[in-house]
């Protein structure tokens, strides 16, 4: 095998590694505020608010106006394209609002899932066309990391070898393109929680998918120290009759990661996958208390599980903005503790305990 020409200089590698480590500083995680216009329609309709650009801006402002308390628990915020170019009520760009808190700005760069022919309803993710140019522009506009989501589902016949291979290679192409532009790629192979499969089946599939992803990243010469992984936790399917404890979920999750994710990867930022706010915090806490060695930071990259209570408090009313922002800060602080294994539970049986599951979830 001939020696491959190094794709990145030592300076480029250092920049990528520094960005990745900053995002997953102990006790910090990611706010995923990258819901597409279509996803925001679902969120806003739940509270009876019209899905307009201005209402989306006002809602993002609720999250982004959080005070300096979030600095110690949020290391990065993932933006949607529209939000990257919006401003707050005072005319300050949202990007600057976030950067002024010492938080890094990320951008969702995929263009959604499309059917994968020759499979039983499986998908691949589009958006590689023009990605190089978009990454170069996003870097100029303040983004230091990116996110790309691939989706796999568990059934009797899925995920197929074809879907696993295709999605792993798409993620690797995306990661390589990001790194050439000084952007840290968050690699997100989400295995949906739809179905009645048990914990063991999800663990097996998660291991197979992650093994394929890291093989593809190696094939594409991706610099692992300058990446982050955004996987699902290993959980039973939503229709599974067996209930598992956070400790069982933690053991299955950490075992799957230990078997597949190289220690060179600086951090694993879990998606919440429709868990309730409280469940997502308790499971993350259990993962960080798991008695197995864990060479990576294990933290959060939550959307709904950081925002649900804030959204309910806001309800589209300017007068509620302050209270809604407080709800977001409270949840962010709880997850900051969970990322260190120091969360004791909120004892909140209310909104925070409500399932946020959406069948066949698409952003």
Curated annotation (Swiss-Prot):
PROSITE patterns: ALDOLASE_CLASS_I. GO terms for cellular component: mitochondrion. It holds the Pfam family Glycolytic. GO terms for biological process: epithelial cell differentiation; fructose 1,6-bisphosphate metabolic process; gluconeogenesis; glycolytic process. It catalyses: beta-D-fructose 1,6-bisphosphate = D-glyceraldehyde 3-phosphate + dihydroxyacetone phosphate. The gene is Aldoc. Substrate binds at residues 56, 147. Pathway: Carbohydrate degradation; glycolysis; D-glyceraldehyde 3-phosphate and glycerone phosphate from D-glucose: step 4/4. It comes from the Eukaryota. Belongs to the class I fructose-bisphosphate aldolase family. Expressed exclusively in Purkinje cells in bands running from anterior to posterior across most of the cerebellum. Expressed at higher levels in the brains of BSE-infected animals. Its EC number is 4.1.2.13. Homotetramer. Interacts with ATP6V1E1. One of its GO terms (molecular function) is cytoskeletal protein binding. This is Fructose-bisphosphate aldolase C. The modification Phosphotyrosine is found at residue 5. InterPro entries: Aldolase_I_AS (IPR029768), Aldolase_TIM (IPR013785), FBA_I (IPR000741). SUPFAM superfamilies: Aldolase (SSF51569). The modification Phosphoserine is found at residues 36, 39, 45. Gene3D superfamilies: Aldolase class I. NCBIfam families: FrucBisAld_I. The modification N6-acetyllysine is found at residue 111. In vertebrates, three forms of this ubiquitous glycolytic enzyme are found, aldolase A in muscle, aldolase B in liver and aldolase C in brain. The active site is at 188 (proton acceptor), 230 (schiff-base intermediate with dihydroxyacetone-p). Keywords: Acetylation, Glycolysis, Lyase, Phosphoprotein, Schiff base.
